[in-house]
Amino acid sequence: SLQGSYDTSPAEGLAGHQMTLSFLQRRSRIVEIVAHGGLVFALAHSGACAAFSRATGGLVCFLNANEDEVIRSLFYNKQNNSLITVSVYASDNFCTLKCRSTPLECIARKELDKGVPLFTSESLKWPGFVEFDDVNAKVLTYNACDKVYKVFDLRDYRELYQIRNEKVTEIKISPGIMLLILEEEEKAPPQDAL
């Protein structure tokens, strides 16, 4: 049975929040839900992301901190009780991923300006990417321009190491091991484990 519902209808949700991209203002299907503590986050296919109060079901705020921000992914970081948003921007032709970490208590108080940009030294233009590994408390980024993979600590976002090898095609992280999958060479194994 239905336990509750959340609504981002314009009458309730968009008043006082300016989003210049018209598609952010239209209803679209929910592609991701993250819930922790007293907050529920709903990310729409359009890129609009709303935070709701679990207690009241009411809209707390939209997480789109900039008017042209399209949020593509959410990650709850239990290491520091924050929500990481991965976004693209119209002003950049939606080309570069930008990450921001905002403490949940700041979101509850509608203080989105307390969010901190992450991985600002990285150029995460497509086909670059960022992946979050909750089990190992690691973040993997790929800077496609420089062909560099970097691993960061999820606790404090410091860089742990980087891998510069044009033959790496994929990286898998498991507890205590990192698997590098390389382009196959003649008479050489196609993978290394670190």
Task: Put a short name on every predicted segment.
Residues Y142-L194:
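WD40 beta-propeller repeat blades
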Residues M19-I33, D68-Y76, L118-F132, E166-G176, ...:
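Canonical WD40 repeat/beta-propeller blade segments in eukaryotic WD-repeat proteins
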Residues Q18-L21, V60-F62, V116-L118, R158-Y161:
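A structural motif specific to WD40 beta-propellers
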Residues S1-T56, S87-Y89, N93-V116, E183:
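Intrinsically disordered, low-complexity acidic/Ser/Thr/Pro-rich linker and tail segments
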Residues G58-L83, V88:
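Blade-loop segments of beta-propeller domains
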